[in-house]
Amino acid sequence: MARSIGCAVMVVGDERQAQSGQLLVRLLEEAGHNITQDRTIKPDGLQIKGELAMLTQSQSSQAIFFTGRTGNALRDPIGDAVRQQLDRRLDGFGDLLRSLLYQEQGSRAMLAQGVAGSIERKLVFCLPGDLNTIEIAMGKLVLPELEYLLNQLTPRA
């Protein structure tokens, strides 16, 4: 059996985005992972950066998930706020997510902003708030590789 990974879930937005956080929590728990934080924060770049800084110092969270407000509109600050803080980027995540979404949505998939990478040996994922997109991202990309990705961040003796 795979190890249980401590996961923080941050919903950026309001009650409309709350369902995306609930879905993330359910999928992570069903996969056997432990939810260390689960809360909603304002769509403000400075607050997102502050939460991210706090979570990267936490000993209980090895993976951090942001959802909601990842689009290209000016009111969607997650992608830029997190991307600026990453030590290493996992650009293939966004590419693969858009490819999977293209199969269902067509050209609208180019607007999807999936961001992933690491900060201080913690994985960070930014997922759109759309429930179908979360199901696809978690089921086909994140959950199958989460433990492997964390192992890549751990120095070998």
Please annotate each region the language model reported.
Residues 1-157:
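Non-catalytic beta/alpha edge segments that cap or flank active sites
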